[in-house]
Amino acid sequence: MGTDAQVKRGSDVYSMQCAACHDAQLAGSGTAPALAGTDFAANWKDENVGSLFERIRATMPADNPGSLKRDQVADLIAFILNFNKYPTAQKELPTDFEALKAIKITAPK
């Protein structure tokens, strides 16, 4: 989900805004959940990308909630999903909540 360029931008956002708490490998820490692997899959199973987008947009980063721009959040989600083995696409993930809500988070193929 998301283009290669969007995943790269998301990786940059993650490194600057998220890795200190969630770990460089998205493994999480005592205070921040894992964003990869079985923990991520269990936490977001059968949810939609819109819910993930809104959670990140409204509550992250923890030291400055709501400070990320909508395009940064979409880029970040593209990176997180790609890290979790979701394939990239020809189109970028949108920043529109309704469009994102239609995308279910299921096990990658």
Predicted features and spans:
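Non-catalytic cap/lid and distal C-terminal segments of serine-dependent acyl enzymes
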Residues: 6, 16, 23, 31, ...
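Electrostatic cytochrome c docking/interface patches
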Residues: 1-13, 29
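Flexible coil segments in periplasmic/lumen-exposed cytochrome c-class electron-transfer proteins
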Residues: 65-109
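Gly/Gly-Pro-rich "capping" loops immediately C-terminal to redox-active cysteine motifs
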Residues: 27-61
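The canonical Cys-X-X-Cys-His
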Residues: 10, 14-25, 76, 80
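An acidic site on a long C-lobe helix of protein kinase domains
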Residues: 6, 48, 68-72
